[in-house]
Amino acid sequence: MTDIKIDQTLDTLGLRCPEPVMLTRKTIRNMAEGEVLLIVADDPATTRDISSFCEFMDHQLLNSETENTPYRYWVKKGL
């Protein structure tokens, strides 16, 4: 686990690509710059999709735990 301050949590357990990334985009759109979203997922595609989403949308992937499910991703909203 990590001690990163979380502003919001998004549970995407049971959802499959592209739903986790679509919900991530929708959720982070309503957050303030600098806030942190914790995404909880079990879709193996998220291991590549979340980092690609962050890079493409200029958000920062602060940390990820992908060794076991559920996967966890800490995303800091960019501009």
From Swiss-Prot:
It is found in: Cytoplasm. The keyword tRNA-binding does not apply. GO terms for biological process: tRNA wobble position uridine thiolation. GO terms for cellular component: cytoplasm. The active site is at residue 17. It comes from the Bacteria. The keyword Calcium does not apply. GO terms for molecular function: sulfur carrier activity. Keywords: Cytoplasm. SUPFAM superfamilies: SirA-like. Sulfur carrier protein which probably makes part of a sulfur-relay system. Belongs to the sulfur carrier protein TusA family. This is Sulfur carrier protein TusA. It comes from Actinobacillus pleuropneumoniae serotype 5b (strain L20). The lineage of its organism: Bacteria, Pseudomonadati, Pseudomonadota, Gammaproteobacteria, Pasteurellales.
